[in-house]
């Protein structure tokens, strides 16, 4: 029996070290050299302090801020999840209708789909350009800015589809909100 057990345990140990230690460390090291900011989580710093990540959404609720998509996990990255409500769910319909009414009351514009539906992860850092533009008036009024200035700031933060082909144009909510704060209003 030991003749079979010893090679099996040696293989288990060797493969565990290779796939559980060496491989992850090698990839982390390569990533740190090739794309150090992305390897560290695409963290955004202000005055030496981490204020968020470009890849993980966070909630903003004040009228002077660009609001993100709804989150099924209440912006908890450790508990990220979708709502798991099906497309025929009465509870989902009620949530969407409630969000739509609130959005339209706050912004005076019809709600784009991404303003009333949570993403699969619940932590999308982006909204559609249409969603961001629809919020410009509310943000401008709350901050005492001209709506055109807020729209220019939003347009400056529109990210195109990857290589112009994949995905959709999008606006990073945290980047816009930090730019609004930096504008001083």
Swiss-Prot record:
Swiss-Prot/TrEMBL keywords: ATP-binding, Cell inner membrane, Cell membrane, Ion transport, Membrane, Nucleotide-binding, Potassium, Potassium transport, Transmembrane, Transmembrane helix, Transport
Complex formation: The system is composed of three essential subunits: KdpA, KdpB and KdpC.
Organism: Cereibacter sphaeroides (strain KD131 / KCTC 12085)
Subcellular location(s) of the protein: Cell inner membrane
Residue ranges crossing the lipid bilayer per the database entry: 14-34
Classification via Pfam families: KdpC (PF02669)
Highest taxon in the source lineage: Bacteria
Protein name: Potassium-transporting ATPase KdpC subunit
Family: Belongs to the KdpC family.
GO terms under cellular component: plasma membrane
PANTHER family per record: POTASSIUM-TRANSPORTING ATPASE C CHAIN (PTHR30042), POTASSIUM-TRANSPORTING ATPASE KDPC SUBUNIT (PTHR30042:SF2)
Membrane disposition: Single-pass membrane protein
Function: Part of the high-affinity ATP-driven potassium transport (or Kdp) system, which catalyzes the hydrolysis of ATP coupled with the electrogenic transport of potassium into the cytoplasm. This subunit acts as a catalytic chaperone that increases the ATP-binding affinity of the ATP-hydrolyzing subunit KdpB by the formation of a transient KdpB/KdpC/ATP ternary complex.
Organism lineage: Bacteria, Pseudomonadati, Pseudomonadota, Alphaproteobacteria, Rhodobacterales
Coiled-coil boundaries: none
Molecular-function GO term, any one: ATP binding
């Amino acid at each position: 029996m030991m003749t079979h057990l010893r090679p099996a345990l040696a293989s288990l140990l060797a493969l565990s070290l290779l796939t559980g230690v060496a491989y992850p460390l090698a990839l982390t090291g390569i990533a740190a050299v090739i794309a150090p900011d992305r390897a560290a989580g695409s963290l955004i710093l202000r005055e030496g302090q981490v204020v968020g990540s470009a890849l993980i959404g966070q909630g903003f609720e004040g009228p002077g801020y660009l609001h993100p998509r709804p989150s099924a996990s209440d912006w908890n990255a450790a508990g990220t999840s979708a709502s798991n409500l099906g497309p025929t769910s009465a509870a989902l319909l009620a949530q969407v209708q409630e969000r739509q009414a609130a959005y339209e009351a706050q912004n005076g514009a019809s709600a784009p789909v991404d303003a009333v539906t949570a993403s699969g992860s619940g932590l999308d850092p982006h909204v559609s350009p249409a969603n961001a533009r629809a919020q410009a008036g509310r943000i401008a009024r709350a901050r005492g800015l001209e709506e055109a200035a807020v729209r220019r700031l939003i347009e400056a933060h529109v990210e195109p589809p990857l290589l112009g082909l994949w995905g959709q144009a999008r606006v990073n909510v945290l980047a816009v909100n930090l730019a609004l704060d930096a504008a001083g209003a």
